Structures are given as structure tokens and as C-alpha cells.
């Protein structure tokens, strides 16, 4: 009792006398927390024993707790203390106060606290649509004219074929701008589409009720599927109808300047067919086909068209299993030189696994399942654009009840390995400086590291769906906390969400328009000690190697394959909040 009274009296003094300034050293999820979920703040380089939760005006102290620490990462000398206020469940808006240091950004505690993020991360894909104007009704102040109709695309010399020789003009409209540039890449669309189609398959009721104000809203299909169809219809046009092969990308010869889409009018090409493109195409269209069956009355015949195209591309890939995209070699042989994103993948074993799995699930034809080795080794690599093995595993787990018995042994292996991965991800979580799965190793901080955090979260959610172990879902939630501000940089990495967010992302429409605010809902790439862009960074420490500057395409660019796992992560946690007990009904 004496200790509690002392803490209370100290709280009265501390909050009023020492905490009249906001401190960047206090890191919180700037969006907020669910009432009954874990709630943690991290305090950098300031030793503290106690913390308080107060109203934003500091007038009322509502909770006092004991901080723990110090914690640090093996690659950094920075120490943190953790303030765990999970037991504080009152809804409202609050700040964390550290005596003699200051107070945090305000945050909300409420049910559905991440719904705006789930909506915005999905709506971001609408803002990246090409071949259509974005009117004020749907885009607000980010309205713009149409860019890149892609109705006059030239077949590049590298893609020349008997029925489509060099210089042939084809039409391949729609799709999304891939990243900060204005090109479209089939390989990167693969993991992007697969991740978001999986979100819809895993949480169909949630997404059927999630509307984001796009032109198709209210047409009888979920908005996530409406948005995916914009890119799917472009992907279909990337298949050569004469042989089933798929062009690797649709691109200008070089990157466009810092222009708005309608002003970027250089000639565009479809470039070389590749095995990786064909297999990504196969997987996406096979998965899309089974989802579209439910909407046959709205998009008649599209499900059949998708599975037929998927099989056609698979057959091409089987006949051409090692056609790799090597841009430098291609440029030595053909003109004009193409120097945009390569997405060259020299190992397509995982793409064969994923494509075969999706064909097997959709068609029921076991020849696809038996055509690949699902377990070439024991690895469980977190997905990325050039590593899609786990997408195959996730689909098999998702459809376990619909599969023939001969597949059950493989599914049990996947369950065991996924649970092992989940345990590795959350091991020693409480001793990490920001109480996040992300950042346990400097290897997490690659180009697009924030997508690593989001994809780690997806792995943990799949483990939760498989086992019911809430520790895995908590781990996924902690990575969302990381992305929303509880990290070494202090940034909430999603544009328009939080109080300190990237304002100068490497994204041409956001840079070239006259608005100070970037397009909302976009996930910045995140800390990258490789610093390949040569910009000035504030730190070489892996988890701090981020700069909010247009020049930093290595840490501050956006990309569809980084946003897609954010869509899944934020939407899944929203969908699961009541079943997991994070929020009351």
C-alpha cells in the first residue's frame, strides 16, 4: 500500500512538473490499440521506473505502471525500456507520460481501431490505377487525369515471336503502377495479387463488408475483389495468345522523370517472356478463378477464362522451365536497352510449387500436385517477390477440408513447420527493444524491410488460424505496432496514418502533384542499411537506416508487393479482433 501511494503522489508531481513537452523518445502505435489486446510503448535511451497513462491534456492520470528494461538489439547499442499497459482497457484517447522526459503522441484505444488503416491500405491501390482518370468523387484532392492508356504497346525485340514479331502493337491497359515508377511487372504482381486474394479467401465475410469508395463499390462484389480485377484484367493481356507464354513486364525503356502520369508519354514495350512470369501468372489466375465462381452472374465467363489461361501458361512454363529474365544479357543482344526494374528470378522452384498448388486446388487434378516436390528442404522462408513457397503452403492449409485424403500427410508437415516458424518468430519477444517480431536479426532490414514485418505477421496469423494459439496473433499485432510507430525511427510508416509519417515518399504522383500530402495508405519501404541510393541517412544502424526523402528509393519508395501484406495484416487483425478477445462485441 505504501509503495502504491508513493507512486500515486509521484504521478501527481511528475505529470504536472516534468512532462509538459512531447518526447520523440517515447514510441507508440500512433494509430492505437484494441481495449483487451497487448498495449506497449517503448522508451529510447532514458531509464525510467514508472510511466503513466493520461488524457492528452495531461489533466487526468488514469493508469500508472512499472517500466521494464533495458532491452537492446544485437546490432545496436541503443537501450529501451518497455511500458506495458495491457491492463488498461478504457476506451478513449490518451498519451504515455514518462516523468522527467515528456509525453508521447496521442493514440486511441477502441474496437476497430485499425479499420481506417485496413481501408486506406486497400484504397491505395485505387490511387495507383492506370488507364483511367481518378475523379474527385473517389480520389478527393488526389484526383488526376488518366495516365498510360497502354493501348499502343510495342513488342520489344526480346519478345519477338512468329505471330507477334518485333514492333507489333498490342493493347494491355489497366493494372497498377508498380512502385514509385510507372511500369507494370508480372512477377511483382504475382505475390501482390496472391497475398490479397488470400486475404479475401481467409476472411470473406470481413471483406464482403469492407467498402472503400471506388467506382465499382456496390456492384455486388467485395471492393477488394473489384480492385484486384483492375490488375487481373491487365495480367490477362500479358499472355501471348499464340503460345501461352507471358511477357515479363510492360515498361518504358528507362524510368520516367518526376512527372504526373498523364505527362509521362514515352513509348512502352512488352519485354521478353519468362518462366517466372508464366508461373506467377498461373498461380494468380488459378486462385482468382475459384474466387470468381461465386460471382459468375456479375462477371460471366471470367472464372473459366482465368483457369484456361492459367493452364495455358503452365504448359508453356513446363516446356520452358529455365527461361530466366536477365536484363543485362538481354540488353547486349537487343535494342532499345531496358533499364527499369528487372525482377529477375534465377530459381523458380518455389514458383512451380505455388502454381502447381493453385492449379491442383482449383481444378482438383492431382497431376499438378504430383508434378512438384513440395518439400525440397525444411526451409520456411518469409515470402517476397522472388520467394513464394509459403503462398503454396498457406493455400493448402486454407483448403485442407476440400482436398483429397492423399494430400493430408503433406498438410500435417506444413502445420508442424509453420508452428515451428511461428515459435521462432516470437521467441524472446519480451527482450526485444521494441517488443516486435521484426528486427530480431539485422537480416530483417533488407530493401522493403517493412514488407518483411508485414509478411512475418501473415505467417503468424496463419499459424494462429491453424492452432488457435493467441500468442501468434499477438505477435502479428506487435508487428503492426512496429509499422505504426513503435520502432527505432519513430515513424508510422503508412502515409496519412499517425502523427509522424513519411511526407516525401519516392512515388511519382505524390511528388509531382502540387499537394503537400502524399497519397494516403502507402507503406514506405522501411529501414535499409544497404542505402543503395546514396542519399544522406541519419544512421547506419540497421533499424534506423531510413530517411524521409524523395531521393531514398532504397528506404522510402512504395511498392504494391509491400502494400499487399499490409492489406492482409491490418484486415486480418480487424477481422479477428472479436474472436481473439481484443475487443468486446
Description of each model-found segment:
Residues 1-21:
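Bacterial Sec-dependent N-terminal signal peptides
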Residues 27-103, 111-112, 127-190, 194, ...:
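Aromatic (Trp/Tyr) and acidic
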Residues 75, 103-119, 207-227:
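Acidic/aromatic-lined carbohydrate-recognition and catalytic surfaces
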Residues 198-230, 263-269, 287-306:
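Short coil/linker segments at helix-helix boundaries
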Residues 222-245:
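Carboxylate/His-rich catalytic cores and anion/metal-binding grooves
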Residues 239-248, 321-329, 364, 430-431:
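Proline-centered turn/helix-capping motifs that create local helix->coil transitions or kinks
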Residues 311-315, 319-322:
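Hydrophobic, small-residue-rich alpha-helical packing segments that form membrane-like cores
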Residues 375-382:
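Solenoid-like repeat scaffolds
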Amino acid at each position: 500500500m505504501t509503495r502504491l501511494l508513493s507512486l500515486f503522489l509521484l504521478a501527481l508531481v511528475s505529470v504536472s512538473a516534468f512532462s509538459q513537452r512531447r518526447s520523440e523518445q517515447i514510441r507508440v502505435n500512433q494509430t492505437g490499440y484494441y481495449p483487451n489486446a497487448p498495449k506497449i510503448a517503448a522508451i529510447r535511451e532514458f531509464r525510467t521506473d514508472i510511466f503513466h497513462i493520461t488524457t492528452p491534456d495531461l489533466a487526468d492520470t488514469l493508469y500508472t505502471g512499472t517500466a521494464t528494461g533495458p532491452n537492446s538489439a544485437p546490432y545496436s547499442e541503443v537501450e529501451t525500456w518497455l511500458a506495458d499497459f495491457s491492463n488498461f482497457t478504457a476506451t478513449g484517447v490518451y498519451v504515455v507520460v514518462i516523468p522527467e522526459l515528456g509525453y508521447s503522441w496521442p493514440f486511441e484505444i477502441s474496437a476497430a481501431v485499425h479499420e481506417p488503416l485496413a481501408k486506406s491500405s486497400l484504397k491505395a491501390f485505387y490511387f495507383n490505377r492506370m488507364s483511367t482518370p481518378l475523379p474527385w468523387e473517389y480520389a478527393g484532392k488526389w484526383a488526376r487525369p488518366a495516365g498510360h492508356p497502354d493501348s499502343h504497346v510495342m513488342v520489344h525485340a526480346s519478345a519477338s515471336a512468329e505471330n507477334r514479331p518485333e514492333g507489333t502493337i498490342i493493347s494491355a491497359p489497366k493494372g497498377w503502377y508498380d512502385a514509385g515508377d510507372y511500369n507494370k511487372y508480372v512477377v511483382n504482381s504475382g505475390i501482390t495479387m496472391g497475398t490479397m486474394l488470400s486475404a479475401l479467401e481467409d476472411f470473406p465475410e470481413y471483406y464482403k463488408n469492407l467498402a472503400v469508395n471506388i467506382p465499382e463499390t456496390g456492384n455486388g462484389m467485395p471492393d477488394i475483389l473489384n480492385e484486384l480485377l483492375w490488375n487481373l484484367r491487365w495480367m490477362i493481356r500479358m499472355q501471348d495468345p499464340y503460345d501461352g507464354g507471358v511477357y515479363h513486364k510492360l515498361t518504358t525503356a528507362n524510368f520516367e522523370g518526376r512527372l504526373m502520369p498523364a505527362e509521362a508519354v514515352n513509348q512502352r514495350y512488352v519485354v521478353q517472356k519468362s518462366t517466372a512470369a508464366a508461373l506467377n501468372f498461373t498461380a494468380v489466375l488459378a486462385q482468382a478463378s475459384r474466387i470468381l465462381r461465386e460471382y459468375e452472374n456479375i462477371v460471366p465467363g471470367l472464372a473459366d477464362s482465368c483457369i484456361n489461361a492459367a493452364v495455358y501458361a503452365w504448359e508453356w512454363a513446363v516446356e520452358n522451365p529455365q527461361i530466366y529474365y536477365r536484363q543485362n544479357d538481354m540488353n547486349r543482344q537487343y535494342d532499345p536497352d531496358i533499364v527499369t526494374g528487372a525482377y529477375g528470378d534465377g530459381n523458380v522452384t518455389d514458383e512451380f510449387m505455388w502454381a502447381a498448388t493453385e492449379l491442383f486446388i482449383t481444378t482438383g487434378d492431382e497431376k499438378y500436385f504430383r508434378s512438384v516436390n513440395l518439400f525440397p528442404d525444411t526451409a520456411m522462408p518469409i515470402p517476397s517477390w522472388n520467394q513464394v513457397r509459403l503462398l503454396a503452403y498457406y493455400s493448402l492449409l486454407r483448403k485442407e477440408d476440400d482436398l483429397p485424403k492423399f494430400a493430408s500427410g503433406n498438410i500435417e508437415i506444413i502445420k508442424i513447420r509453420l508452428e515451428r516458424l511461428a515459435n521462432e518468430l516470437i521467441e524472446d519477444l519480451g527482450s526485444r527493444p521494441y517488443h516486435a517480431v521484426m528486427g530480431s536479426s539485422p537480416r530483417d532490414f533488407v530493401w522493403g524491410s517493412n514488407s518483411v514485418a508485414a509478411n512475418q505477421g501473415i505467417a503468424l496469423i496463419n499459424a494462429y488460424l491453424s492452432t488457435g494459439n493467441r500468442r501468434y496473433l499477438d505477435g502479428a499485432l506487435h508487428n503492426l505496432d512496429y509499422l505504426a510507430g513503435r520502432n527505432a525511427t519513430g515513424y508510422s510508416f503508412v502515409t496519412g496514418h499517425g502523427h509522424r509519417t513519411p511526407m516525401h515518399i519516392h512515388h511519382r504522383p505524390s511528388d509531382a502533384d502540387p499537394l503537400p500530402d502524399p497519397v494516403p495508405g502507402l507503406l514506405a519501404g522501411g529501414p535499409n542499411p544497404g542505402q543503395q541510393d546514396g542519399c544522406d541517412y541519419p544512421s547506419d544502424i540497421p533499424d534506423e537506416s531510413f530517411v524521409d526523402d524523395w531521393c531514398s528509393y532504397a528506404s522510402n519508395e512504395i511498392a504494391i508487393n509491400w502494400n499487399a501484406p499490409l492489406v492482409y495484416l491490418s484486415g486480418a487483425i480487424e477481422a479477428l479482433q472479436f474472436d481473439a478477445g481484443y475487443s468486446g462485441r
